[in-house]
């Protein structure tokens, strides 16, 4: 793909003429065509300088913003590590605080130096360190917030990608326009070498600009692919969490049903025991009532017998005393 893009760029920006071709031409250009060519070259140079300054300013601002965020994350991590060391080693609090202050000063100085020379700081900062800091920062965030942040970064990368594509297309159109103008208008023999070198310089500058933009597009595409992979991973984790919650809910429902059945069986068993004990007590009470009734009848019979025996004995005694007297 890179070879095809390079071949396409070479075909697109191949000059239509060289110094030798111009020297071999015998046509004499007019003064009006010379003035028009000079004006078009000057306008082309002004447009390129304006677009180049604008792109450099935007790149500088974005680098400053990204470096400021990285420095804030590094400073926060250093402060947390220092606090952790202070809590572990209470005897070394002074040295730990001194180290944390040195870290703050060094980070502030590094931020100021990167603010003065932002184009070099991003190149000097290792890519692995930036990835490690970004990974730790993403791990501390919740999955939902991380997903929202990645969606925002994805939208921002898409906007940057579209903007760079538009700038790339506009630059191609401008190149085609100026190449057609230069090809259709004759050049002065005396200014041919100067104009050719200037045009080559401008074309080379535009090639470099387009190459840089193509690199930016490639980097943005890689970042976009990484963001998509992270989003896919988070979606899988979210799906797994939902499945785990569903299983846990199902287990809870099954446990509740089993607990209800167990409580019901225990209640029925206890009620059966109580009914059995109640029936035993009723039987004992019935037996006791029967025995009491039997005893009452026996006492009644005994009372009657005793009363009758007393009457008989008194009559015998009276008869005996009468006979005696």
Swiss-Prot record:
Does Methyltransferase show up as a keyword for this record?
no
Gene that this polypeptide is encoded by: CCDC160
The lineage, from the top, is:
Eukaryota, Metazoa, Chordata, Craniata, Vertebrata
The similarity comment for this entry is: Belongs to the CCDC160 family.
Coiled-coil residue windows: 144-288
- Give the residue ranges for region: Disordered: 18-45, 81-123
Bias (Polar residues) ranges: 92-123
Q: What is this protein called?
A: Coiled-coil domain-containing protein 160
Alphabetic keyword roster: Coiled coil
PANTHER family according to UniProt: COILED-COIL DOMAIN-CONTAINING PROTEIN 160
Q: Which organism is it from?
A: Homo sapiens (Human)
Report whether Mitochondrion shows up as a keyword of the record: no
Where are the compositionally biased (Basic and acidic residues) regions?
81-91
């Amino acid at each position: 793909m890179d070879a095809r893009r390079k071949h396409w760029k070479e075909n697109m920006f191949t000059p239509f003429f060289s110094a030798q071709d111009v020297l071999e031409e015998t046509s004499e250009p007019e003064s009006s065509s010379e003035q028009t060519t000079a004006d078009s070259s000057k306008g082309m140079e002004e447009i390129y300088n304006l677009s180049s300054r604008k792109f450099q300013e935007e790149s500088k601002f974005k680098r400053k913003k990204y470096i400021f965020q990285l420095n804030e994350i590094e400073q926060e991590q250093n402060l947390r590590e220092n606090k952790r060391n202070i809590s572990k080693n209470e005897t070394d609090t002074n040295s730990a605080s001194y180290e944390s202050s040195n870290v703050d000063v060094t980070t502030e100085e590094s931020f100021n130096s990167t603010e003065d020379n932002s184009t070099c700081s991003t190149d000097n900062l290792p890519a692995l360190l930036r990835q490690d800091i970004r990974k730790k920062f993403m791990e501390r965030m919740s999955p939902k917030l991380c997903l929202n942040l990645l969606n925002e970064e994805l939208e921002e990368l898409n906007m940057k990608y579209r903007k760079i594509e538009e700038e790339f297309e506009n630059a191609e159109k401008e190149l085609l326009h100026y190449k057609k103008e230069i090809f259709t208008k004759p050049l002065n023999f005396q200014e041919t070498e100067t104009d050719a070198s200037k045009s080559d310089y401008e074309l080379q500058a535009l090639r470099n600009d387009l190459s840089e933009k193509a690199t930016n597009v490639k980097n943005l595409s890689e970042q976009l692919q990484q963001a998509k992979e992270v989003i896919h991973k988070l979606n899988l984790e979210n799906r797994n969490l939902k499945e785990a919650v569903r299983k846990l809910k199902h287990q809870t429902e099954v446990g509740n049903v089993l607990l209800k059945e167990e409580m019901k069986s225990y209640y029925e068993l206890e009620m059966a025991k109580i009914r059995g004990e109640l029936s035993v007590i009723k039987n004992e009470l019935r037996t006791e009532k029967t025995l009491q009734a039997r005893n009452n009848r026996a006492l009644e019979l005994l009372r009657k017998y005793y009363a009758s025996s007393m009457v008989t004995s008194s009559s015998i005694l009276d008869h005996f005393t009468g006979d005696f007297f």
